[in-house]
Each structure stands twice: as C-alpha cells, then as structure tokens.
Amino acid sequence: MSIYSIVTAPDERLKQKSKPVLECTDQTRKFMHDMLETMYNANGAGLAAVQVGVLQRILVIDIKAHDPVERPKDFYPLFIVNPEIIEQSTELVTANEGCISLPEQRIEVMRPESVKIRYLDYHGKSQELKANDWLARVIQHEYDHLEGKLMVDYLSNLKRDVVLRKLKKLKNNIV
C-alpha cells in the first residue's frame, strides 16, 4: 500500500474537472486501496482522486464510526467510480465541514439533505445508492471535488479570499 501526498488549496488541480474512468481494472482497485490508506492516514471521512493529484472520477468514503444509520457490516468502505447525482432532496441542511485539502479550515455549507447516486463499485458493477444525513453530505463534498469545486466556493468572494490567503500563508510556512 502507498500513502500519497495530499494536494492542498490553492493548488490549481483542485479546480479542474476530473475525467471518467474507462474501466475498473486491478490497477484501479489498487489505486482505490491506496487512496483509502491515504484518507485514513489524513483522518479523513472521504477522498477524491484529485486530492492526490489524479484527475479521475474516483471517491473513497468511510464514515463507519460516525454514521448514525445502522448499515450492513461490509457496507464501508465505499469505493465509488464515475458517480452521477441522479436525485437530490429539495430540503437543504447547513452543517460545518472540513476538508483535508483545506487544512485547519471549517466552513458552514448548505447542501441537500439526501441524494441518490449512480456509480460503478469496486468491481466495476453499476450501483445506485440513496444516502441522507452525514453520508449524503460526504458524498456531495467529495463529488464537488470531481467537479473542480471546493467548499470555499460556497462562501462569498470576500470570505473565500480570506480563507485562501490563510491557506497560502500556511502552505508557505510549511514548505
């Protein structure tokens, strides 16, 4: 297993739209496992491939410890390839979010309370998943990464600029 470096804002790769995966191969599955290890290492709930510098439509999610919904034992981790949001609720919920690509930042984001996605699973089989509450939020957050959107994009221009300046300063102090 490999642990990748996390791409952090204001890196321009995070603003690019990811490309579909053409086929789920053994190499794709190994990459997903490496993404999962990287996510665990960073104490994340989800990770999009772009966050490790790969512009492919792949997400990994594991919120087992925080999911209020009782799920089958083998439900997590979720390996999600080429997701599409096919339904979303009209009810919006605001909650505080963090992101491993935006270190030390917490932002209130309003999102649909539930979503339904269509995607390819670990084996490349088409699946649909209806999610609400915390899982829906994590899916939408990670999906945004595939679209080149960050949680700061939900802020006003002024607030977004303040956060991005903080991140740039933080990044310069680390390097």
Swiss-Prot record:
The function of this protein is: Removes the formyl group from the N-terminal Met of newly synthesized proteins. Requires at least a dipeptide for an efficient rate of reaction. N-terminal L-methionine is a prerequisite for activity but the enzyme has broad specificity at other positions.
Q: What is this protein called?
A: Peptide deformylase
Could you tell me the gene encoding this protein?
def
Q: Which organism is it from?
A: Rickettsia typhi (strain ATCC VR-144 / Wilmington)
Q: Which GO terms describe its biological process?
A: translation
Positions binding Fe cation in this chain are: 99, 141, 145
Q: Which SUPFAM superfamilies match?
A: Peptide deformylase (SSF56420)
Which terms does the record give in the GO molecular function aspect?
Answer: metal ion binding; peptide deformylase activity
Stated EC number for the protein is 3.5.1.88
User: What cofactors does the UniProt entry give for this protein?
Assistant: Fe(2+)
Concerning its family, UniProt says: Belongs to the polypeptide deformylase family.
Cofactor details (free text): Binds 1 Fe(2+) ion.
Provide the reaction this enzyme catalyses. N-terminal N-formyl-L-methionyl-[peptide] + H2O = N-terminal L-methionyl-[peptide] + formate
| HAMAP family for the chain | Pep_deformylase
Q: Does the keyword Metal-binding apply?
A: yes
Stored Pfam families:
Pep_deformylase
Q: Which UniProt keywords apply?
A: Hydrolase, Iron, Metal-binding, Protein biosynthesis
Does the record bear S-adenosyl-L-methionine in its keywords? no
- Active site, per annotation: 142
Q: Which InterPro entries match?
A: Peptide_deformylase, Peptide_deformylase_sf
